Amino acid sequence: MSNMVTIRVSDFTTLPGARYKKDGDGSAEEFFDKYIKQHLEDRESILIDFDNTWGYASSFLSELALEISRQCKRGKLNVREKIKIKSNDEPGLTERFWGYIDESANINS
């Protein structure tokens, strides 16, 4: 089994916001590029810790899910085996995130 790496969104920003870098600081695109992508390429499992921020825009969550889904598909990785979610501050966020993953799987088909 591969190693598990923990990535805290709060280490990136406490104000996650936009979908794309061009839309401003704290974007999902930047978070994916700086924190997630390398670990998927290295085939490490990832625990994304969504705690200790001021909340999440749907644009941030949906873009992050889409990028993760795309990368997993390219690498022939099972996203549900590679990605684990921690969200004690907002328990419903886990369900929302997996919903976006499921939607993005349909988009990427």
Residue ranges and their predicted role:
Residues 8-44, 48-98:
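Amphipathic alpha-helical interaction surfaces in cytosolic regulatory modules
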Residues 96-109:
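The feature marks long, low-complexity, polar/acidic/proline-rich intrinsically disordered regions embedded
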Residues 1-6:
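Small-residue-rich anion-binding loops in enzyme active sites
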